[in-house]
Amino acid sequence: MRLLVIDGNSIANRAFFGIKLLTTKDGRYTNAIYGFLNILLSLLKECEPDEVAVAFDLKAPTFRHKMYDGYKATRHGMPEELAQQMPVLKELLADLGYRTVTAEGWEADDILGTLAAACAARKDDCFLATGDRDSLQLVSDTTTVLLAATVMGRSKTVTMDVDAIHEKYGIEPRQLIEVKSLMGDTSDNIPGVKGIGEKTALSLVQTFGSLEGVYANLNDKRIKPKQREHLMEDKPMAELSHTLGTIRTDAPIDTAEGSYAVGEGNKAAAVRLLQELEIHSLIPRFGLD
């Protein structure tokens, strides 16, 4: 069985910023919807999945926000032009037969992680479509990340499997969280250790294996005095960053095989909505004509 899991917020965000604002004659924004559905069609062609789940974040604070007040505190809110499109996108996905999944108090990342773990337990293939590099820690023999990226000014999907992680970072996928706990993450406002950037964090993890391994070898001569000083001062922040950055695999969602089989949906409603949105070109591409 092959499961495709789409990080709904991430891909919608990519679609929104990757396509100029489009509106209907009566002023409804449509660029994120149009871009998302085009990406969905490309993913279906590339993965040929048996089941599809689309994970979305909820507005409610997650366990990470409750753990650390600063978590994602520097992020700007969703642009209103995108926010207006999100409920319409979800309605369209349902009409097309695709199941969306959310979990209060959890992030879409954790839904991806939970479904990937369920697939691994069954030895099923799982494809995670996202623009968020955090999900690379989930890559395994059964899980491949399809990373939406901008290469040479053009949007494309980069396939990240175990070999690709080895080639790019020189470590195992699961060790990427060890790197993040040291370097932090400005986009999520995860603190990390002061003065430790990606290059140094990677080198430390390549040498000592993990955050725990780094702290077990603080007196090793390969750790520079200034690095040692920062590591000692910021150990609580590094440990907090490790917890915040680790994608969970136990979100309270359906994980049984068959839970995300594409249904009949409501084709007539999908056609009406696409016509209202003046996205006529997608009607035949989804087999709705």
Which residue ranges define each predicted feature?
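Noncatalytic, basic helical substrate-engagement surface that gates or grips nucleic-acid strands
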Residues: 1-129, 133-155, 159, 237-240, ...
